[in-house]
Amino acid sequence: MDRQQQLRRLQGGLIVSCQAPADSPLHQPEIIAAIAVAAVQRGAVGIRLDTPEHVRAVRDRLPETPIIGLWKRTFPDSSVYITPRYVEAEAIAAAGADIVALDCTLRPRPDGEDFCQIIPRLQQELGCAVMADIDTLEAAIAAAKAGADLVGTTLYGYTEATQGQTPPGWDLLETAAQQLPNTPVICEGGIASAQAARQACDRGAFAVVVGTAITGIDLQVQAYVTALNARP
């Protein structure tokens, strides 16, 4: 299946991000895979995953489901952490991801790499589609020019350039969808209800990624407990 066929399978649908904090008991490949299977059985068109181990586990359970894979790694010389280098992207592709997600914000990467070089290598050498996780319209345009198959609003509100902003970035989504008619725009971040997911598509999203609101047990419980403990 070529890259365009993979993208068409996502159009208009829900992609569930199945991730857990590293210190969570849910951060086990077999548990993440079970969560992913449950999501697909209920209609999710794709799954977004962190780490090669989790991608591999889900691929074994869901051989036909589109997987967006990434690898979060931190480095002292860069604030980029979503698939920061080609070596991480290559490992995610080798684990079975159809689409590799990487930070395509306009920030310096570790080892001096550039997403403009990583994107074509993934497409040409490995045959993978690329989802560019961006924070601003400028970054979205740059990623599209570099050949990204998709752009996602994933990092809106999480970078220095968008500090103080709260996702979802509706204006960013709408403007990117208008200015990049040939590059599908994925809405990711801050989608906390089914109604918000539908609103994202109404505003131009090609598809919607939802994580915390569906699979984020650790963060959801913490939020409830914090609210209850704040009572006088």
From Swiss-Prot:
Keywords annotated in UniProt: Carbohydrate metabolism, Isomerase
GO cellular component, one term: cytosol
Gene Ontology biological process terms in this record: carbohydrate metabolic process; N-acetylmannosamine catabolic process; N-acetylneuraminate catabolic process
SUPFAM superfamilies: Ribulose-phoshate binding barrel
EC number: 5.1.3.9
A GO term, aspect molecular function: N-acylglucosamine-6-phosphate 2-epimerase activity
CDD domains per record: NanE
Highest taxon of source: Bacteria
Keyword Cell wall biogenesis/degradation: no
Pathway: Amino-sugar metabolism; N-acetylneuraminate degradation; D-fructose 6-phosphate from N-acetylneuraminate: step 3/5
Catalytic activity: an N-acyl-D-glucosamine 6-phosphate = an N-acyl-D-mannosamine 6-phosphate
InterPro entries on file: Aldolase_TIM, NanE, RibuloseP-bd_barrel
Family per similarity comment: Belongs to the NanE family.
PANTHER family: N-ACETYLMANNOSAMINE-6-PHOSPHATE 2-EPIMERASE-RELATED (PTHR36204:SF1)
Function of the protein: Converts N-acetylmannosamine-6-phosphate (ManNAc-6-P) to N-acetylglucosamine-6-phosphate (GlcNAc-6-P).
Protein name in the entry: Putative N-acetylmannosamine-6-phosphate 2-epimerase
